[in-house]
């Protein structure tokens, strides 16, 4: 069974720009998939539709049995609990430290503080930021900010990890 099935998806913006037209894709559990294309070819639009920031004009997007296109706004959290998302523009919370930015992803799921501390420190060590826990996003390089975003995306062990240019700002660890 497919983890993701996208069928005949179309998205046209109000400006008339066609981002996706009759797009189809199936991804099975365990597959590692890259979507590549020129700037403006619809890659980021596709990603936004996968985590339901945007809806397609036509077609269906099924993720783990959930019809994303028909999901009511008040139920979007059900989908997002299963996803880890690495955004190309970071979306870090500027008034929170590195630790707090990553911990936030667990706090919304009501983990206890001990679980949060243990897991956040494991993940920050994994991405090479264990020594930056008290710093704020504006005190980090672009590559370090990107690693915080990656840590936040994986801290909850998501069933699906969606990345929009995840290595764009990374330096070697």
Regions found by a protein language model. Give the residues of each.
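Helix-to-loop junction immediately C-terminal to a conserved catalytic motif
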Residues: 51
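Conserved ABC transporter NBD signature motif
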Residues: 59-67
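Short coil-to-helix segment of the ABC ATPase nucleotide-binding domain corresponding to the Q-loop/switch region
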Residues: 96-104
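Conserved ABC ATPase signature
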Residues: 135-140, 144-146
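Hydrophobic anchor residue at the start of the ABC signature
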Residues: 150
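A short, proline-enriched helix->beta-strand linker immediately N-terminal to the Walker B motif
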Residues: 155-159
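Catalytic Walker B motif of ABC-type/P-loop ATPase nucleotide-binding domains
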Residues: 161-164
């Amino acid at each position: 069974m497919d983890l993701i099935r996208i069928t005949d998806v179309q998205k046209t913006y109000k400006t008339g720009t066609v981002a996706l037209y009759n797009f189809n894709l199936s991804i099975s559990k365990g597959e590692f998939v890259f979507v590549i294309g020129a700037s403006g070819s619809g890659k980021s639009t596709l990603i936004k539709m996968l985590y339901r920031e945007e809806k397609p004009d036509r077609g269906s997007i099924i993720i783990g049995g959930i019809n994303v296109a028909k999901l009511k706004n008040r139920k979007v959290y059900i989908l997002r609990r299963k996803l880890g998302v690495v955004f190309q523009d970071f979306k870090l919370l500027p008034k929170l430290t590195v630790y707090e930015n990553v911990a936030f992803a667990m706090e919304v799921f009501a983990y206890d503080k001990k679980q949060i501390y243990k897991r956040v420190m494991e993940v920050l060590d994994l991405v090479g930021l264990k020594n930056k826990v008290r710093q704020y996003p504006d005190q980090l390089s672009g590559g370090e900010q990107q690693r915080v975003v990656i840590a936040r995306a994986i801290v909850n062990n998501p069933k699906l990890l969606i990345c929009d240019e995840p290595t764009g700002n990374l330096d070697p660890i």
